[in-house]
């Protein structure tokens, strides 16, 4: 409860009429719905890291890259590969298949960024379509320091969201 309220206080500081907080960290993610100035609903994913920052970091390291460079090259992707939003085991095989087919690292990195967001939106939050996330969205958690993940969310939503410069610290606000 205390952490959830910290996330809400932090989001409200950056966007007073926030309606949705999407927090993706290294190991878990949460979505808080705000209604009439109070936390109305909380959705959590703590069982699987396939939609979290550690998932991306592991892939970057497997290619001998740090996560910053891995994210940066994703922004230059021409054709992000569709890797779905399944568990890490399935994702590993899809990435290997893409590599065998000559897909660029940039397109794989961008595809993984989309996978993180699709996992959050469609598996954890269980939206029918991305636009159902809400109109006034604040993103939090260290995963959103990754510009490719942020951009994937904004492209799927069709609009910008608010990412505070202290996104990874919002749970302690």
Language model features: what each stretch is:
Residues 36-79, 168-171:
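Glycine-rich phosphate-binding loop plus the immediately following alpha-helix
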Residues 115, 128-156, 167-168:
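Glycine-rich phosphate-binding loops at beta-strand->alpha-helix junctions
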């Amino acid at each position: 409860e205390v952490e959830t309220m910290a996330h809400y206080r932090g989001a409200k500081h950056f966007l007073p009429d926030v309606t949705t907080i999407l927090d993706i960290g290294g190991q878990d993610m949460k979505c808080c719905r705000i209604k009439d100035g109070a936390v109305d609903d909380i959705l959590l994913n703590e069982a699987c890291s396939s939609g979290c920052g550690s998932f991306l970091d592991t892939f970057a390291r497997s290619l001998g890259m740090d996560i910053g460079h891995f994210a940066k090259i994703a922004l230059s992707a021409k054709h992000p590969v569709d890797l779905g939003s399944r568990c890490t085991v399935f994702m590993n095989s899809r990435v290997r298949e893409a590599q065998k087919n000559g897909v660029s690292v940039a397109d794989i990195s961008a595809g993984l960024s989309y996978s993180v967001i699709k996992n959050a939106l469609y598996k954890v939050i269980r939206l029918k379509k991305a636009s159902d996330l809400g109109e006034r969205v604040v993103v939090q958690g260290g995963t959103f320091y990754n510009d490719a993940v942020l951009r994937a969310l904004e492209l799927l939503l069709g609009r910008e969201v608010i990412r505070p410069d202290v996104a990874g610290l919002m749970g302690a606000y």
